Amino acid sequence: MAFDWTSFIVRININAPAQKLYDAWATRDGMEHWFLRLSEYKKPDGDLRHNLEHTEAGDNYKWLWHGWPDDTVEYGKILEANGKDFFKFSFGKAGNCSVKIFRDIGENFVEITQDNIPDDDHGRTNWHLGCKTGWTFYLDNMKSLYEGGIDLRNKNILLKGLVNA
Protein backbone atom coordinates (compact mmCIF):
# COMPACT_ATOMS: atom_id res chain seq x y z
CA MET A 1 0.00 0.00 0.00
CA ALA A 2 1.36 3.43 -0.98
CA PHE A 3 1.96 6.11 1.65
CA ASP A 4 -0.79 8.76 1.76
CA TRP A 5 0.92 12.13 1.31
CA THR A 6 -2.41 13.97 1.09
CA SER A 7 -3.16 13.93 4.83
CA PHE A 8 -1.79 13.35 8.31
CA ILE A 9 -2.99 13.33 11.91
CA VAL A 10 -1.14 14.69 14.95
CA ARG A 11 -2.56 14.38 18.47
CA ILE A 12 -1.50 15.12 22.03
CA ASN A 13 -2.99 14.74 25.49
CA ILE A 14 -3.25 17.98 27.47
CA ASN A 15 -4.25 18.27 31.11
CA ALA A 16 -6.63 21.21 30.69
CA PRO A 17 -10.43 21.59 30.48
CA ALA A 18 -11.87 20.76 27.05
CA GLN A 19 -13.53 24.17 26.71
CA LYS A 20 -10.23 25.92 27.42
CA LEU A 21 -8.59 23.83 24.69
CA TYR A 22 -11.35 24.74 22.23
CA ASP A 23 -11.06 28.42 23.14
CA ALA A 24 -7.33 28.15 22.42
CA TRP A 25 -8.27 27.69 18.74
CA ALA A 26 -11.46 29.70 18.42
CA THR A 27 -10.44 33.03 20.00
CA ARG A 28 -7.78 35.60 19.25
CA ASP A 29 -6.47 35.51 22.83
CA GLY A 30 -6.32 31.72 22.71
CA MET A 31 -4.37 31.53 19.44
CA GLU A 32 -1.93 34.23 20.50
CA HIS A 33 -1.30 32.50 23.84
CA TRP A 34 0.25 29.32 22.41
CA PHE A 35 0.55 29.65 18.62
CA LEU A 36 0.62 32.99 16.83
CA ARG A 37 2.03 36.50 17.11
CA LEU A 38 -1.23 37.86 15.64
CA SER A 39 -4.56 36.17 15.08
CA GLU A 40 -7.40 38.22 13.63
CA TYR A 41 -10.82 36.74 13.04
CA LYS A 42 -13.18 38.81 10.91
CA LYS A 43 -16.90 38.29 10.52
CA PRO A 44 -18.28 38.01 6.98
CA ASP A 45 -19.27 41.71 7.15
CA GLY A 46 -15.60 42.61 7.82
CA ASP A 47 -15.97 43.46 11.52
CA LEU A 48 -13.11 42.21 13.68
CA ARG A 49 -14.07 39.76 16.41
CA HIS A 50 -13.15 40.72 19.98
CA ASN A 51 -10.21 38.99 21.69
CA LEU A 52 -12.33 36.49 23.65
CA GLU A 53 -15.16 36.16 21.11
CA HIS A 54 -15.49 32.79 19.39
CA THR A 55 -14.94 32.76 15.67
CA GLU A 56 -17.67 31.13 13.58
CA ALA A 57 -17.96 29.30 10.28
CA GLY A 58 -17.70 31.80 7.44
CA ASP A 59 -15.26 34.09 9.26
CA ASN A 60 -11.92 34.97 7.67
CA TYR A 61 -8.61 34.98 9.47
CA LYS A 62 -5.20 36.64 9.26
CA TRP A 63 -2.29 34.97 11.07
CA LEU A 64 1.29 36.10 11.74
CA TRP A 65 3.95 33.94 13.41
CA HIS A 66 6.64 34.78 15.94
CA GLY A 67 10.11 34.68 14.40
CA TRP A 68 8.82 35.60 10.93
CA PRO A 69 8.41 38.99 9.23
CA ASP A 70 4.99 40.51 8.52
CA ASP A 71 5.12 39.41 4.88
CA THR A 72 4.88 35.80 6.07
CA VAL A 73 1.14 35.90 6.56
CA GLU A 74 -1.62 33.33 6.24
CA TYR A 75 -5.14 34.29 5.18
CA GLY A 76 -7.93 31.76 5.28
CA LYS A 77 -11.49 30.90 6.19
CA ILE A 78 -13.10 29.21 9.14
CA LEU A 79 -15.04 26.30 7.65
CA GLU A 80 -16.64 24.87 10.81
CA ALA A 81 -16.70 25.85 14.48
CA ASN A 82 -19.16 24.22 16.87
CA GLY A 83 -18.25 26.13 20.04
CA LYS A 84 -17.07 23.11 22.04
CA ASP A 85 -14.98 20.41 20.36
CA PHE A 86 -14.56 20.82 16.59
CA PHE A 87 -12.84 23.55 14.58
CA LYS A 88 -11.97 23.46 10.86
CA PHE A 89 -10.14 26.01 8.71
CA SER A 90 -8.63 26.37 5.27
CA PHE A 91 -4.83 26.50 5.30
CA GLY A 92 -3.92 28.04 1.96
CA LYS A 93 -2.47 25.70 -0.66
CA ALA A 94 -1.53 23.30 2.16
CA GLY A 95 -5.13 22.02 2.41
CA ASN A 96 -7.58 22.12 5.30
CA CYS A 97 -7.09 21.51 9.02
CA SER A 98 -9.64 19.97 11.36
CA VAL A 99 -9.16 20.17 15.12
CA LYS A 100 -10.99 17.75 17.35
CA ILE A 101 -11.05 17.97 21.16
CA PHE A 102 -12.01 14.69 22.84
CA ARG A 103 -11.67 12.72 26.04
CA ASP A 104 -10.31 9.17 26.22
CA ILE A 105 -8.89 7.06 29.06
CA GLY A 106 -9.41 9.95 31.49
CA GLU A 107 -7.40 12.43 29.39
CA ASN A 108 -8.30 15.35 27.11
CA PHE A 109 -6.79 15.23 23.63
CA VAL A 110 -6.26 17.75 20.85
CA GLU A 111 -6.10 16.13 17.41
CA ILE A 112 -5.29 17.90 14.15
CA THR A 113 -6.02 16.36 10.78
CA GLN A 114 -4.57 18.18 7.80
CA ASP A 115 -5.98 16.94 4.50
CA ASN A 116 -6.31 17.90 0.84
CA ILE A 117 -2.52 18.33 0.70
CA PRO A 118 -1.35 18.35 -2.94
CA ASP A 119 0.40 15.07 -3.80
CA ASP A 120 3.43 16.47 -5.60
CA ASP A 121 7.05 17.07 -4.55
CA HIS A 122 6.26 20.55 -3.19
CA GLY A 123 3.20 19.33 -1.29
CA ARG A 124 5.04 16.36 0.17
CA THR A 125 8.05 18.38 1.32
CA ASN A 126 6.58 21.73 2.37
CA TRP A 127 3.08 20.84 3.46
CA HIS A 128 3.06 17.22 4.53
CA LEU A 129 6.48 17.05 6.19
CA GLY A 130 6.78 20.77 6.99
CA CYS A 131 3.30 21.24 8.43
CA LYS A 132 3.44 17.96 10.37
CA THR A 133 6.70 19.12 11.97
CA GLY A 134 5.17 22.52 12.71
CA TRP A 135 1.97 21.15 14.23
CA THR A 136 3.98 18.72 16.35
CA PHE A 137 5.98 21.61 17.81
CA TYR A 138 2.98 23.88 18.35
CA LEU A 139 0.95 21.14 20.06
CA ASP A 140 3.95 20.53 22.35
CA ASN A 141 3.99 24.27 23.09
CA MET A 142 0.25 24.21 23.79
CA LYS A 143 0.76 21.36 26.25
CA SER A 144 3.67 23.17 27.90
CA LEU A 145 1.74 26.41 28.38
CA TYR A 146 -1.59 24.89 29.43
CA GLU A 147 0.06 22.54 31.91
CA GLY A 148 1.99 25.37 33.57
CA GLY A 149 5.20 25.24 31.58
CA ILE A 150 7.12 27.76 29.56
CA ASP A 151 6.50 29.25 26.12
CA LEU A 152 8.81 27.40 23.73
CA ARG A 153 8.30 29.70 20.73
CA ASN A 154 11.22 31.66 19.28
CA LYS A 155 10.22 35.33 19.32
CA ASN A 156 13.51 36.68 17.92
CA ILE A 157 13.08 37.43 14.22
CA LEU A 158 16.88 37.45 13.77
CA LEU A 159 17.14 33.73 14.53
CA LYS A 160 16.44 31.65 11.41
CA GLY A 161 15.88 28.00 10.58
CA LEU A 162 14.55 26.98 14.00
CA VAL A 163 11.94 24.33 14.66
CA ASN A 164 10.26 26.66 17.18
CA ALA A 165 9.56 29.53 14.78
Language model features: what each stretch is:
Residues 61-66, 86-92:
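Short beta-strand segments that buttress and anchor functional surface loops
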Residues 9-10, 29-75, 154, 163:
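Short beta-edge strand/loop motif at the mouth of beta-sheet-based domains
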Residues 16-34:
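Amphipathic alpha-helical segments
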Residues 21-22, 31, 61-63, 78, ...:
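Hydrophobic pocket/interface hotspot
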Residues 88-137, 153:
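Beta-strand/loop substructures that line and gate deep hydrophobic ligand-binding cavities in soluble
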Residues 1-9:
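Short acidic N-proximal helix/loop "leader" segments that mark the beginning
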Residues 12, 75-79, 96-103:
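Hydrophobic/aromatic beta-strand elements that line small-molecule binding cavities or substrate pockets
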